[in-house]
Amino acid sequence: MLEVDVEKQLGRFSIAVRFEATQRATALFGPSGAGKTSVISMIAGLIAPDRGRILCNGRLLFDSQAKVNVPPYRRRIGYVFQDGRLFPHLSVTRNLDYGRRMYGLARDHGEWDRIVAMLELRYLLDRRPGTLSGGERQRVALGRALLMRPQLLLLDEPLASLDTARKAEIMPYLERLRDEAGVPMLYVSHHAGELRRIAATVVRIDLGRVVAVGGPELLSIADADALG
């Protein structure tokens, strides 16, 4: 379970959010500029909150009063960005291995085979990122995040840079990830259609505040039209 209660001042924009993520897939939903990426950057340790605390599976990651701020590389949180952020000079195999090696983890061949099969990466392993489609690059980024054996997976608009065809290509892999990977997901998007297929719980955020928490019913047709 993820527990977040943080405040952060970013210039004139302030964030003060409190929520829990207890399901396999929780959505952070809201318009562009609502503060979604800043919130997950605080969870990942890329931005330090001004005040508050963050716990993941009972482990304290940040507490302003106790002066606890676990560095990003020790949080065991997988982060998938909009653009994948693969290393262009490394093969797919070496990109997949990067997170595991950064944490000093031995390769678990059973786990490797399972994730490569789940994301259908076998035929890509010898290729470089520059030869991959956008959807293929995101699948590699997902595999890399999973192979570091994270406690939590953060997905920041993972389909935003893809065209409609590539979005349709990768969505089934995200659904398999939710159902088969065994890692809780916090999925950030302002597109209601994506989140209806992925999330069991929706945390709606606007202007740096949580304005509603509930099920997929929060993703109404009006929201899709207004935000998408």
Q: Could you say what each language-model-derived stretch is?
A:
Residues 59-64, 107-124, 175-176:
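Conserved ABC ATPase "signature" region
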Residues 61-78, 102:
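ABC ATPase NBD coupling module
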Residues 90-109, 118:
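ABC-type ATPase nucleotide-binding domains, specifically the catalytic core motifs of the NBD
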Residues 128-132, 136-138:
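Conserved ABC ATPase signature
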Residues 147-151:
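A short, proline-enriched helix->beta-strand linker immediately N-terminal to the Walker B motif
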Residues 153-157:
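Catalytic Walker B motif of ABC-type/P-loop ATPase nucleotide-binding domains
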Residues 182-188:
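Conserved H-loop
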